[in-house]
Amino acid sequence: MNPANYLILSALLFTIGTVGVLVRRNAIVVFMSVELMLNAVNLTLVTFSRIHGTLDGQIMAFFVMVVAAAEVVIGLAIILSIFRTRRSASVDDVNLLKY
């Protein structure tokens, strides 16, 4: 498959993730949209790595996946904390954590 197709797919995935972050108010959906954006970046890194014949992009994609795994743990803990106190997973309730 042509590498340009992978880059187009990556741009499409990133755009869908961006729209999800900007439009949705549910914290879980926003969180999934951010993960979709990270996966789009991973696809771009691996595609450029494949084009240039090096492993640098694949190694960077691996580190992005490790950081995303840590983000999942911390993000879900914060969302769970908000849900337990407000019984809602809306991002409008984020100011709750100030107190």
UniProtKB/Swiss-Prot annotation:
Record-stated family: Belongs to the complex I subunit 4L family.
Subunit structure: NDH-1 is composed of 14 different subunits. Subunits NuoA, H, J, K, L, M, N constitute the membrane sector of the complex.
GO molecular function: NADH:ubiquinone reductase (non-electrogenic) activity; quinone binding
Organism: Frankia casuarinae (strain DSM 45818 / CECT 9043 / HFP020203 / CcI3)
InterPro entries found in the cross-reference section: NADH_UbQ_OxRdtase_chain4L/K, NUOK/Mnh_C1-like
Keywords, alphabetical: Cell membrane, Membrane, NAD, Quinone, Translocase, Transmembrane, Transmembrane helix, Transport
Pfam families the UniProt entry points to: Oxidored_q2
Coiled-coil stretches noted in the UniProt entry, renumbered to this chain: none
Gene3D superfamilies for the chain: 1.10.287.3510
GO cellular component: a single term: NADH dehydrogenase complex
Reactions mediated catalytically: a quinone + NADH + 5 H(+)(in) = a quinol + NAD(+) + 4 H(+)(out)
Subcellular location: Cell membrane
Record-given protein name: NADH-quinone oxidoreductase subunit K
Main location: membrane
EC identifiers of the protein: 7.1.1.-
Free-text function comment from the UniProt entry: NDH-1 shuttles electrons from NADH, via FMN and iron-sulfur (Fe-S) centers, to quinones in the respiratory chain. The immediate electron acceptor for the enzyme in this species is believed to be a menaquinone. Couples the redox reaction to proton translocation (for every two electrons transferred, four hydrogen ions are translocated across the cytoplasmic membrane), and thus conserves the redox energy in a proton gradient.
Membrane-related topology note: Multi-pass membrane protein
Record-level GO BP terms: ATP synthesis coupled electron transport
Transmembrane segments: 3-23, 28-48, 59-79
EC class of the enzyme, as a word: translocase
